[in-house]
C-alpha cells in the first residue's frame, strides 16, 4: 500500500508502503501522457486495481462534507457541451491508482480556490466490466468526439485520470496523469509538486 504524505492524509492513518519510489524524471506535458495502462493511466477495461484502504480514501474525499466534487454522468457531460456550459471535469474511478494519487491533490486545490468539479465515475460498479468507456456506448462515442484526441494517438480513447476545463461548451485545456507505474511505485514529492503546479495553472483557465 502506498504511503501518502501527511499533509494530504491528515484525515486517515495508513499502514506502511510496499511500493518503490517513482522516477520523477518520467513525466507528461499538460495535455498528453502515456497511454499504456501500466505506466500512465487506466484504459477502458484494463486491470487497474488497488487496496481497499486506497479505494476508501478516494471515496471518503468524494463524500466529505466539504467535498468540491459533484457527481455527474456521461450524459450530463454531453449536455454541458450541447448547452455551452462551463465546468471543471474529472473522469476517474475508485480503483485507478493514478486517480488515487491525483485525487487528494486536486481536492485540496479545488477547496482552496473554492471551485466545484464535476466528477464522472467511469466504472460505476467498480469492475472493469462496468466501464462506461465502451465503443458500443453511444454516449461515450459522443463524448469522445466532444473531448477530441485526448490520448494523442488519433484513437480518441479516453484514459483516466482526466481533468478538463470546459468553457462555453468547449474544451479549453486538459490534463492527464504523470507517466509512471502507479501499480508498483509510490508517487514522489517532486511529482506531487508538479501536479500542484499543473493543476493550479489549469484551473485558472
Residue ranges, per PLM feature:
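Bacterial signal peptide processing site
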Residues: 18-20
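Positively charged n-region of N-terminal signal peptides that target proteins for export
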Residues: 1-4
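Short active-site neighborhood of thiol/selenol oxidoreductases, capturing the structured segment around
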Residues: 82-94, 106
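Thiol-based oxidoreductase modules, predominantly thioredoxin-like and allied folds used
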Residues: 91, 115-142
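N-terminal leader/targeting and pre-domain segments
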Residues: 26-84, 194-205
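Non-catalytic, surface beta->alpha helical segment in thiol-disulfide oxidoreductase systems
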Residues: 154-205
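C-terminal motif of bacterial Sec signal peptides marking the signal peptidase cleavage site
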Residues: 13-16
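Typically the conserved alpha-helix immediately C-terminal to a functionally engaged Cys/Sec
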Residues: 100-113
Amino acid at each position: 500500500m502506498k504511503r501518502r504524505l501527511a499533509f494530504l492524509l491528515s484525515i486517515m492513518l495508513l499502514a506502511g508502503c510496499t511500493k518503490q519510489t517513482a522516477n520523477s524524471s518520467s513525466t507528461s506535458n499538460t495535455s498528453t501522457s502515456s497511454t499504456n495502462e501500466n505506466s500512465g493511466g487506466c484504459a477502458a477495461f484494463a486491470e487497474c486495481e488497488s487496496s481497499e484502504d486506497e479505494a476508501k480514501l478516494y471515496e471518503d474525499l468524494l463524500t466529505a462534507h466539504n467535498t468540491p466534487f459533484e457527481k455527474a454522468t456521461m450524459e450530463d457531460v454531453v449536455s454541458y457541451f450541447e448547452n455551452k456550459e462551463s465546468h471543471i471535469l474529472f473522469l476517474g474511478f475508485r480503483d485507478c491508482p493514478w486517480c488515487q494519487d491525483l485525487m487528494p491533490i486536486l481536492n485540496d486545490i479545488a477547496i482552496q480556490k473554492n471551485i466545484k468539479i464535476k466528477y464522472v465515475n467511469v466504472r460505476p460498479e467498480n469492475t472493469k466490466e462496468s466501464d462506461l468507456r465502451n465503443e458500443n456506448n453511444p454516449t461515450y462515442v459522443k463524448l469522445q468526439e466532444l473531448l477530441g484526441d485526448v490520448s494523442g494517438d488519433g484513437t480518441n480513447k479516453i484514459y483516466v485520470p482526466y481533468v478538463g476545463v470546459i468553457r462555453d461548451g468547449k474544451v479549453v485545456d486538459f490534463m492527464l496523469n504523470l507517466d509512471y507505474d502507479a501499480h508498483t511505485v509510490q508517487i514522489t514529492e517532486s511529482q506531487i509538486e508538479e501536479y500542484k503546479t499543473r493543476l493550479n495553472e489549469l484551473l485558472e483557465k
